[in-house]
Amino acid sequence: YWLWGASPKVSAITIVNRCTILKPLFHVCSKHNILISELSKHEEIYEEIAAQYKGKRRIAGLQELVALSKDIGFTILDEDSLRKFSKYLVVNDSNQTPYIPPRIWAYQLERLETCIDDFLSISDGVISVFNSFMDNHNQTNENRKFINEQFNKYNVSVMLQKWTNFDPDTAKMPNFSKYLSMVSFASIAYIVNFSLMRISEAYLLRYGCFSKTLIDGQEIFLIHGVTSKTEKGEASWVVSPSVEKAIKALEIICELRFSCAKKIFGIKQDITDYKPYLHIPVFEPWGSGRGENERLEHIRSTIPYNNQISTFDKIFDPKELQITQVDFNIACKMTPNLDTEIYQVGKAWHFAWHQLRRTGAVNMLASGLITEQSLQYQLKHANTIMSLYYANNYYKLKFK
């Protein structure tokens, strides 16, 4: 079939790789005098077969067997068998993304939410300050008195001091832009925590991506975007109701910066028609690192989570991120190949965007409230076996 089937144009190395994937199945079946077409009925040899596989990429390749069943005329492993087989797999992959210990994960989530809530509490003032700066930036960019008057008038100064290293004695307009960028980062991080989307997918979210719908009388909250991991580019993620405020914060900042971009690029459309990326670059004329030389449709480069924490160093308290012995034990249990040079008791947890995705996957399955199929949908995986790899060891985590 691989030579003369629907897609005959394959290289020799591709054929070799595919045969390598199948070899353990045939070898163990032959050893036990079991027809390969009867493999689904013999779970007792799954563990022996699984022991011969290393790394998730070859394992994930088994999912092709399901799709080929009708074409080749028989089934080697069906969907249910793949799910059972995956439970015997021992992940031997030094690149397994670390699982964030619950205490640290909950702390970062709480701080992100507080940052967003604080911003929304002064959002009217933020809009007023932004518009005032737009009207007067040519004359007042270095007028510290005017800048502080605006910050104080609209109660923005308190939040700048709480969340950034703002000093009224050295107040500048770029301080304001940095605060907006920080809130934008916090909102994106909050969304990723609850949606499990890839950070690249979060960066592609556009204005107006959030919606609510009623299903069987229950209100469901959705984020609409794009993904490259499914046949259809368009995708939706089910999210917590609390994600709405993160979207709201992003929309406010997007509206302000888009108003500047319209003048720079001569855009005639309203924001609701244009639908720019929510995580929009800095376009305000006084902003540090403003995006005038960027195209509005340019997809921003992903900045590592830990780098963002260093840039916006008042979001998290380093002491709260220090790994305790309990944190370390949980991290090692969930990720046996954890890099203990990076993750040690007493050191601050080193964050990465993909950790939010894996941690969420583990927590969802461990809760017992989410099915494997629902997790697969949320992660935008082609098969449940891939999702189970993400949630590896979830059964070791107990929620009360």
Predicted feature residues:
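Non-catalytic DNA-binding core/recognition domains of DNA-processing enzymes
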Residues: 3-84, 101, 181-186, 192-195, ...
